[in-house]
Design a protein with these regions (language model features):
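Secretory/organelle targeting and membrane-embedding segments
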Residues: 1-153, 157-496
Length: 496
């Protein structure tokens, strides 16, 4: 799509929270420092805590120093950015706040030429979404005022199919779908975007991207950290809700989708939805065949002893919450019929890593060995984080007088090739929202399909009669039962 730079105002509701401090303002600063943020712009922070505009600016200065990818080169540059920051205190449940926000926006817009473009960011707990959406509608702030008006909503988008539909209904009563941006920061990561370029801009890969050549796909999102201070939240969520429903299913759809007509929001969302429709529904009677859950116990991470999940603050001593989840999904269409997609995510794993591994079939006839098992099949690994890049393994002759084969890797690393670290995901996604490009956001129907797919698993795990989650040692790659889970197809989990 064509991008034009116009003035805009961003209102961050929940500006005193961690998301604003660690991600949003650092991303906005990095965009400004890189001269990619449209100007003139204004950023209005709002939260319950009382603070002056100067106090807010000082806090954001400390935030940028600590968390931004790009550090302020000089006070002059920072001062120019800070002059666009302001603060409006208030309770998001109080209609009076929205009158104050309207007045602040009108003052900013009246002092500069150009349309009144407004972007609202819900950086609050999801429990406040309904209240905020309702107040934005009742106050008239949701209606465009001579420019565009948009809203960004953070995950989780509900906690099941019913609540997701309710949230979409609340949003739809106030905003049009093209005004709504449901953010999944994984889609803003450089390597995730490069997945589509890899597929559709290189003729060597797309002909192999099907059941005739691909034996299996593994998608891993592992975290070395535990629940930290989020024990109470995690008790209500769990790994399946927190990570699988959004991040991993989005990655699956990007990997499995057909080529869109153009790389624009509508065609891309349509193709991702076709994948969701093609995923084989989960039979409630066969949950154990397609899903497995685990929970971390005590262990060692980087040589330090750590407590198990049930010993974390805010967690019930008899909790059955999943901190590890694995799925085996099948995509029943012409391209992927019979190819298993294995998805796994967990906390307190051996290390922090996110990757997609595409394992290809073995050669149909190995002429170099009588036993073809001596040569590993080709594998393409797309590393999402850390150390963004790609690696392709191929068979090659090892040096020496005898004909012996070994596996070698062709490795591409972003930092080495481009000489700079990739931008943070929020930088790309915030800029896309300003430019009206929702390609890397989630659409309402996709969100509901994802919850509908996982509903049988969530229902089964919620039953009192359900088995306890399998325990795994903190610092490991998950429960031992997960290896039996994948070995039923003759496979094995990769060790990233």
């Amino acid at each position: 799509m064509t991008r034009t730079d116009e003035p805009f105002a961003l209102v961050i509701l929940g500006a005193s929270g961690d998301l604003t401090r660690r991600k949003l303002v650092p991303a906005l600063w990095s965009l400004y420092a890189g001269r990619t943020l449209p100007e003139p712009f204004a950023i209005i922070g709002s939260a319950r805590s009382e603070a002056s505009a100067d106090e807010f600016r000082r806090r954001m200065r400390a935030t940028v120093r600590e968390f931004a990818r790009v550090k302020p080169p000089s006070e002059n540059v920072w001062d120019r950015f800070a002059s666009a920051l302001s603060y409006v205190p208030g309770d998001p449940a109080d209609p009076a706040l929205y009158a104050k926000l309207e007045a602040a926006l009108r003052e900013i817009e009246g002092a500069r030429p150009g349309p009144a473009n407004r972007l609202f960011y819900c950086a609050t707990p999801p429990s406040l979404y309904e209240t905020i959406i309702g107040n934005l509608g009742a106050s008239g702030l949701a209606r465009p005022q001579g420019g565009w008006t948009r809203i960004i909503v953070e995950k989780p988008f509900g906690r099941d199919h019913e609540s997701a539909r309710a949230l979409n209904s609340q949003l739809g009563a106030v905003f049009r779908e093209e005004q709504i941006y449901r953010i999944d920061h994984y889609l803003g990561k450089e390597t995730v975007q490069n997945l589509l370029v890899l597929r559709f801009a290189n003729t060597i890969f797309e002909p192999l991207w099907n059941r005739n050549h691909v034996a299996e796909v593994q998608i891993t999102v592992a975290e070395a950290l535990g629940v930290e201070t989020r024990g109470a939240y995690y008790e209500e969520a769990g790994a399946l809700r927190d990570m699988m429903q959004n991040h991993l299913l989005q990655l699956l759809c990007l990997l499995a989708m057909e080529p869109p007509v153009t790389f624009d929001a509508g065609p891309v969302h349509d193709e991702k939805n076709k994948v969701m429709h093609a995923i084989r529904p989960i039979d409630p009677r066969k949950i154990d065949e397609v899903a497995l859950r685990g929970q971390y116990g005590p262990g060692f991470v980087e040589g330090k002893a750590v407590v198990g999940y049930r010993g974390e603050k805010g967690v019930a001593p008899d909790s059955r919450t999943d901190t590890y989840a694995a799925l085996r999904l099948l995509v029943d269409n012409w391209r992927w019929a019979g190819v298993p997609f294995y998805l796994r995510t967990g906390k307190r794993m051996a290390k922090r890593v996110s990757e997609i591994a595409i394992r290809f079939h073995r050669t149909p006839h190995m002429i170099f060995h009588r036993d073809p098992s001596g040569v590993e099949p080709n594998e393409l690994v797309i590393r999402i984080q850390p150390d963004e890049g790609m690696a392709l393994t191929v068979a090659a002759k090892t040096p020496g007088p005898e004909l012996k084969l070994g596996t070698v890797g062709l490795d591409f690393r972003y930092g080495e090739v481009f000489g700079a670290e990739p931008p943070e995901a929020y930088e790309r996604l915030l800029l896309d929202a300003v430019h009206g490009d929702s390609t890397l956001y989630a659409r309402a129907d996709w969100v509901e399909h994802a919850w509908s797919l996982l509903g049988p698993v969530l229902d089964a795990w919620a039953q009192d009669s359900a088995a306890q989650p399998y325990l795994y040692e903190a610092g490991s790659w998950g429960p031992a039962e997960a290896y039996a889970f994948i070995s039923r197809d003759g496979g094995a989990w990769r060790k990233p």
